[in-house]
């Protein structure tokens, strides 16, 4: 008798027990193998026969490949993004930046949005989806990231309002923006990371010198000229970096405030233009 979806998920959960999200991982992989949404699967597919394609997916996850890379997408804010090797996987923690912007701008929203280090397009495209009248620019040093972000913009119907191109932080940008979003690399070069991050996600998007602050040093002197009067900059930080980043920004004449994520950890520096 063929193994049921329910039983296969249970067995995979045990196999993936080294992951903090083993059950969720197994459910997402099974839904992908079935070609349905996870919620649909949980409501009506659990007693069906498990598909043969499930086992190879579990084996990939057991080798620490991120679920988002295996299934090819990740939800962020109100949108779903295609992701793959060479681009950082969006994290729920980064939604803190969008929450700060929504609190500040309300329904009216910003007119122009800048995303420095656009990656998959998560921050820029979430902002454009939130405010239908906004337009934006996203830049990244990675050609792979630019390619993936452009694909996401096209798939979400946002390409007409989003310009996405190669760029190194603010170099070559000579206009000001109402909303500036940035999730720069901020991990110390010697830091030990979980295998699914260390083995698969791009180091270019993770590491920022011996103290993790190199890219904040690059950003600090550029923010004032990029942020429009009355605008808002939301810049992600590591959980223990607020004092150091605030000091860097203060040295550049910027007055920042700390924004915490839903877990109560320092997650972003907020600067008003």
List PLM regions with ranges.
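Conserved SAM/SAH cofactor-binding pocket of Class I
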Residues: 92-194
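Conserved Class I SAM-dependent methyltransferase catalytic core
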Residues: 211-271
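Non-catalytic accessory regions of SAM-dependent methyltransferases
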Residues: 1-42, 46
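Conserved hydrophobic residues forming the short capping helix/wall of the S-adenosyl-L-methionine
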Residues: 16, 105, 153, 223, ...
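Conserved AdoMet
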Residues: 28-103
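Mobile active-site "lid"/loop adjacent to the S-adenosyl-L-methionine
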Residues: 186-215
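Residue-level signal for inorganic ion chemistry
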Residues: 29, 64, 94, 123, ...
């Amino acid at each position: 008798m063929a193994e049921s979806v329910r039983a296969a998920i249970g067995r995979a959960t045990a196999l993936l027990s080294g992951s903090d999200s083993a059950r969720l991982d197994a459910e997402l992989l099974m839904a992908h193998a079935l070609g349905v949404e996870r919620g649909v699967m949980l409501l009506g597919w659990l007693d069906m026969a498990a598909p043969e394609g499930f086992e190879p997916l579990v084996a990939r996850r057991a080798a620490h490949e991120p679920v988002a890379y295996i299934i090819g997408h990740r939800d962020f804010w109100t949108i779903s993004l295609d992701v793959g090797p060479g681009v950082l996987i969006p994290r729920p923690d980064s939604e803190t930046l969008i929450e700060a912007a929504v609190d500040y701008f309300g329904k009216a929203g910003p007119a122009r949005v800048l995303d420095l280090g656009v990656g998959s397009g998560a921050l820029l495209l979430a902002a454009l989806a939130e405010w239908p009248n906004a337009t934006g620019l996203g830049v990244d040093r990675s050609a792979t990231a630019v390619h993936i972000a452009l694909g996401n913009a096209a798939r979400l119907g946002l390409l007409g309002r989003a310009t996405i191109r190669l760029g190194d932080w603010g170099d070559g940008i000579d206009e000001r923006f109402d909303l500036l979003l940035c999730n720069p690399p901020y991990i110390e070069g010697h830091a030990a990371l979980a295998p699914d991050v260390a083995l698969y996600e791009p180091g270019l998007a993770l590491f920022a010198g011996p103290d993790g602050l190199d890219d904040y040093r690059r950003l600090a002197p550029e923010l004032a000229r990029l942020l429009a009067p009355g605008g808002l900059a939301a810049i992600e930080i590591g959980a223990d970096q607020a004092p150091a980043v605030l000091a860097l920004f203060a040295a550049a004449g910027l007055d920042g405030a700390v924004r915490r994520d839903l877990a109560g950890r320092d997650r972003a520096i907020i600067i008003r233009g």
